[in-house]
Amino acid sequence: MNKRGTALVRAAIVWMVFSLVPLFAVAQEGHPMSGSWVGDWGVGATNRNRVVVILEWTGAEITGVINPGPNAIPIKSATVDPSDWSLQFEAQGPDAQGKMVAWKVEGTIDDLGTYNRTLAGSWNVGNTQGDFSITRQ
């Protein structure tokens, strides 16, 4: 093969590699629930609490934490229904007075086809019932 032929082959290979890179990037997104979710929960429009939820699909189950850091609350159990993309998870954490109580969160994912999809529904901490809305970052 002459120099011109070798250069054309190299150019074709480079073009193929760079044209396939976006396909690999899209394929790496993973499970629709996996990722960092940021938003708030609370009772009414003025009593809101900022919340960060980290969710991960392990291939067998959804795991995660609420408000990661030194006082993170691990999610004990989580289920997702792919027919309507509803999610339920439970945890054990402190209420407003610091007493350990059950946390129960139920929501439905919106904008499934977008990267910054939202999850919204009910957020219960002990006897306190509220709502939440979080967006994947």
Short names for language-model regions:
Residues 23-27:
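Sec/Tat signal peptide C-region and signal peptidase I cleavage site
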Residues 1-8:
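N-terminal secretory signal peptides that target proteins for export/translocation
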